[in-house]
UniProtKB/Swiss-Prot annotation:
Entry annotated with the keyword Chloroplast: no
Phylogenetic lineage: Eukaryota, Fungi, Dikarya, Ascomycota, Saccharomycotina
EC number annotated for this UniProt entry: 5.3.1.24
Top-rank taxon: Eukaryota
EC main group: isomerase
Pfam families per UniProt: PRAI
GO CC entries: cytoplasm
Catalytic activity: N-(5-phospho-beta-D-ribosyl)anthranilate = 1-(2-carboxyphenylamino)-1-deoxy-D-ribulose 5-phosphate
Protein keywords: Amino-acid biosynthesis, Aromatic amino acid biosynthesis, Isomerase, Tryptophan biosynthesis
Protein name per Swiss-Prot or TrEMBL: N-(5'-phosphoribosyl)anthranilate isomerase
Gene Ontology MF annotations: phosphoribosylanthranilate isomerase activity
Family named by the database record: Belongs to the TrpF family.
Pathway named in the protein's UniProt entry: Amino-acid biosynthesis; L-tryptophan biosynthesis; L-tryptophan from chorismate: step 3/5
Biological process annotations from GO: L-tryptophan biosynthetic process
Length: 224
């Protein structure tokens, strides 16, 4: 497994995050999203209800088994004790852990034995991306997002792409991108240097609720 292909996806990775209903999860699966994300950080507006989390997990596993298509449940955490993360991983059947705090992704990966997506903030965390490129860790994907994450704040894509292009081996730098993505701009995001996947939450919502049409259009535009 490599940083790019541990999910088994042959194209760009598409993650729909902040799911809070089985209906939205079913839409994401039917639209061919690769990764379904649930917020496991307490007291956030998109924090998942435990009952719904288990139902979404069952949907992901049933879809994977029936279709043979790799789909994964991603649990999003932020500066939570490893033991608490492990408890929810086991309870919800989480496949991939996404870390949005100051955690050491290596420590959590070793403790949990799971793939990790690590949120990076540009430009302060560029050294983590460079280190990952040189070490080629297994089952690890960097993710550029805003400091808070889930705010819909549009990142400075051009600065990130320009920075990648200036590096000694730009072809070795791969990461997912989040922050302000929508069905309308996701195609442009995937054409930037280094981007191998996209992560959306608010960009597929209407009045704070996941919108099936927006989810379907986002995935379609990302995959075409």
């Amino acid at each position: 497994m490599s940083v790019i292909n541990f999910t088994g996806s042959s194209g760009p990775l598409v993650k729909v995050c902040g799911l809070q209903s089985t209906e939205a999860a079913e839409c994401a699966l039917d639209s061919d999203a690769d990764l379904l994300g649930i917020i496991c950080v307490p007291n956030r507006k998109r924090t998942i209800d435990p009952v719904i989390a288990r139902k979404i997990s069952s949907l992901v596993k049933a879809y994977k088994n029936s279709s043979g298509t790799p789909k994964y449940l991603v649990g999003v955490f932020r500066n939570q004790p490893k033991e608490d993360v492990l408890a929810l991983v086991n309870d919800y059947g989480i496949d991939i852990v996404q870390l949005h705090g100051d955690e050491s992704w290596q420590e959590y990966q070793e403790f949990l034995g799971l793939p990790v997506i690590k949120r990076l903030v540009f430009p302060k965390d560029c050294n983590i991306l460079l280190s990952a490129a040189s070490q080629k860790p297994h089952s690890f994907i960097p993710l550029f997002d805003s400091e808070a994450g889930g705010t819909g704040e549009l990142l400075d894509w051009n600065s990130i792409s320009d920075w990648v292009g200036r590096q000694e081996s730009p072809e070795s730098l791969h990461f997912m991108l989040a922050g302000g993505l929508t069905p309308e701009n996701v195609g442009d995001a995937l054409r930037l240097n280094g981007v191998i996947g996209v992560d959306v939450s608010g960009g597929v919502e209407t009045n704070g609720v996941k919108d099936s049409n927006k989810i379907a259009n986002f995935v379609k535009n990302a995959k075409k």
